């Protein structure tokens, strides 16, 4: 008998992966956590039936959420990561010797524990001495912080369930306050393709625009996320990622599977239908 993992992207669209075995299934105080093993995508884990990370394509997401802001401002030293319980975002950040401190705030400790056991590919740098783990609500955490971070990365789940509060005007305003005068905020911005995800994307973009003077959106192709077309938000008090001297990033000699400085320039060139959505967020 064949075992398939099937995820509902809309009420009329489903995405399936053939599974060899289910490695873990459990429920925390916040969500259901499942880990599967597959031939095509390796080990992958889901939260409440939604894909979070696969061994095969996680490099795309983590490259793009980390290296775009790091190339824009190579002097980043103090970073806050909200969410990111799989550890992949922290893994990429620890590759920068110039970063002195990484605070990671994850609401669900069980996510981290499960990923440490089943996804060492992403979780293998959570014990880096520069990393401090806080198992609490990121929304509450940023309320008490002011003028502290050079970069905040919001590596959250979708804008419903435990991650819902990370898409509010209050949250983005508190992130602005928590950043230094030249600080950068990057967040996963959902997909523009399916209607429900596009609504979440437009709502997030509208609220970020109300807080930050520099506000851009960039994209990547992530095969296991709904539609495969995924967006990221880039907001800053000072730096425009299209005007920064990003070629200096190449001097670091970091080996990446997805990100490069040519792609950095190109990923901000959006399709017309996405441009129109972003232009009309106030309607």
Curated annotation (Swiss-Prot):
Ranges for domain PABS: 2-237
HAMAP family assigned to the protein according to its UniProt record, in alphabetical order: Spermidine_synth (MF_00198)
Listed name of the protein: Polyamine aminopropyltransferase
GO molecular function: spermidine synthase activity
Record-listed E.C. numbers: 2.5.1.16
Annotated keywords: Cytoplasm, Polyamine biosynthesis, Spermidine biosynthesis, Transferase
Native organism: Clostridium perfringens (strain 13 / Type A)
Lineage: Bacteria, Bacillati, Bacillota, Clostridia, Eubacteriales
Record GO cellular component, one term: cytosol
Gene name of the encoded protein: speE
